[in-house]
Amino acid sequence: SRETGFIRELKRLGYEVKLNSSSLPAAGTVGLWFRPPEFASQLETSPAAWNFIYNEDYYPFDWRGLKKFPVVLTPYRELYEHYARSNIRTAMFTVGVNTTDFYAPETVFQPGYKVYPLVYYGDNNKSSPLAESLKKQSGNNKPSPLAGSLNAQNSTVQGSVWFMGRFWENGLPQLVPQGTPAEKGRELSRAFIAAVYADPETPAAKMVPAETAEAAAAGALVIMPSNPAVKEIYGDNVIMYEKESDFPGLVDYYLQNPEISRAKIVAAQKITADRLSSAASARRFKEILDWLRQNVEP
């Protein structure tokens, strides 16, 4: 599951972590809560100096009326928008993705190897115009014309378009990878290109989408709209475009230049593991605590 790498690394660093425990943290310690039963009432009586809540769900917990100050750890930076809209007092830190599930140590490029030409991540709340167009063209069971054209250009590619995100699970379930995060990660590790979409009108477009890190860690070349936060971390190893009409040409170029693609994929994998994995976030735990003590009153 998504939290595994983060919690495993915390334990390795010497922190005591109790999950779904009926006992409360000791006074003066740091409490880490992961989906505990009735966590809100437990938090109110927790004697811990700081109470961290790990939220792996895309939408926030409902804790209106909670007097304690919780600190949220989440893979989804977009969650901050939800908490701010609800006027919930909190601090939030992104703990990245679990590269145990999503990291593929080696990406294979060889003639005849079956790869998927496109893994398309639709935004959870709003799809891209390109995705809408593909949906209308594909029908219920037909492959996308875009995938077909890519397949015609490169005989090693088997045409298929994958969509990920809640928007697509009802509309085009046959195009959504199914299963556990590890199973989806294996699908991504067999992908050639992952197209990540972040609606430019939302705060997510100014942050690193979780899908970007997951796809990069799994060994797919990421192509996405221009995003300064992603550019700062990944540099030119994530491909970006200003106009959606440029997207098919970029896909064609990188499909026909696998060595260039491979170099960017390997570099993006390493960046993800070093900077955005949940284990990397756990190594910053002391830094997070120091910041809280200096800047926030519990």
Where are these regions (language model features)?
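Conserved acidic donor-binding segment of nucleotide-sugar-dependent glycosyltransferases
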Residues: 238-245, 253-258
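Nucleotide-sugar donor-binding catalytic core of glycosyltransferases
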Residues: 1-28, 35-46, 55-236
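A charged, aromatic-enriched C-terminal amphipathic alpha-helix characteristic of glycosyltransferases
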Residues: 256-290
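Short, hydrophobic/aromatic alpha-helical segments in well-folded domains
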Residues: 68, 211, 250, 267-268
